Each structure stands twice: as structure tokens, then as C-alpha cells.
Amino acid sequence: DRLRSRGLGDVYKRQILPNLLNPFFSMVAHYINRALVNRGYRMLLCDTEYDYTKEREMVQMVAQNKVDGIIALTYNPDLKIPPDVRSVSIDRYLSGSTTCVASDNYNGGRLAAQKLVENGCKNLAFLRIGSPLTSETNKRRDGFVAECEAMQLPCTQKILMDDAPLSEFEHFLEENLKDGRLAFDGIFCVTDKLAVAVIKMLRRMGQRVPEDVQVIGYDGLRAFGDQDYYCSTIIQPVEAMAETCVELVLGETNPNTPSLLCLPVRYAYGGTTKA
């Protein structure tokens, strides 16, 4: 009942990702592929370009070819996976018994607030662009805001949907600039990708990072994959998440696995905070 290549005897798992141009998605694909290869499996990678129709087509192909399992990172809340196909999702909730694997987003948000305050910040901001769908990534904001409230610190928020232009963040920053000073001195961005864009905006406005404004992202992305961090960041344990996904989809774990597995995160200095 397994899909095999022409006479080679390779066993396949399929991974569905929305877009490989996103460096976090590429990192996820890398580690999942490595975990599968180490177990004698091969990965069929589906880059769906955020197209729900393509995702459905990929799942139909899985059902027809009897691929062993699916590891999905999808923005489609209505994606249906056949009940006889083992499946795992990353960060998103799928219907049925599919387990969701994620980093500890809530505590990651709390940690970002703590680090900004430890580095002397007194007025914080949270910036996010993303899907309106319910997902584990939403908890980054929840944890950050909760920690700000616990420390009795002001927290300004700017949240955009996926289709909004990034220039709206620049307008937001400009609106909070008075006499050459920004209204907040610490910013937590929902991803490293957004953090890098915001840092460029700040510097265009004459704001020094980290001297005037400190910025923390989320993901743990490195330049060229293995060099310096793009920014100070909350690191997702992507390799451990990939191993967990593979263990689940291969049935190597306890059959009574909970519907959500959260893996611990950590902070790393990347030059956009004071320490």
C-alpha cells in the first residue's frame, strides 16, 4: 500500500508547504527531509503557493497513490485529509485526529517581552502580519501582551492581514514618531522576516537599532542557513519539530498522543537588541 519509485523500492511521505520562498518553510522542509531520509523514506514536496485548490489536488493525489502520510503546513482551514492516511500539521489545526506540532508560541511571546525589558525597554510594541485563521502562532501575541500586562508596561499593537501592504507598518511607525523619537523603544515582530523589514523602515526614519529601538523577531533564521542570525530572535526548535512530525506520521510515538505538542523555545542575540 505504499507509493514506490520505479523499481527503486523507496517509500514516500508527502509534505505540503504554502511557499518555499519563505525561509522558515524552507528550513522546515530541510529538516523533515533529513529525518525521513535517515529512516529510509523519501519526501515528495508540494509547494502550493497558498492556493487552496492546489492543496486539495495534492491530497487527492495522496489518496490515489496511497502515500504513507502527510506533513502539512497549510493556511486552508477546510483541507480534508483521508482518514486512512496518517497526517501531522505544523502550527495549524486540521480536522479529525491530526496532531498539531508547534513551538511554544505563548512562552515565546512572554520571553520576547522579558528580554526587551531586561535590555532597558519601557514602552513596547507588537507587530504582526498574518492569516486571520486560528493557529498556534496567534499565541505569540497572547504571551507578549500577557507579559506586558504582568509587568504593567504599555503595549501598542499593529496587526495586519496577509493581503495588506507592508507599507502600512511604515505609516504606523511614522504616526508614532515625534520630535525624532519613537513612542516605543522595544518591538516584537511575529516573524524574523517581518522584523528585518521593520528594521529597514526604522533606519530609513533615522532610528538606530538597537541604540534607539530594540527589535526581536521569531523563528531563528540565519543568513545563508548557518551564519549570523538576521536579528535578535526567539528560536523555534525546527529540527526537533521535524523529528516529532516524522515520528508521529510514521507511528513511532504513543498512539494516545495529545492533539497539540508544543516544543520549548529559546532566545538568541542577533544584534538588534543590546544583549
Enumerate the predicted regions with their spans.
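Short acidic/polar active-site loop segments enriched in Thr and Asp
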Residues: 68, 121-124, 185
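Single conserved hydrophobic/aromatic residue that forms the stacking wall/gate
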Residues: 1-12
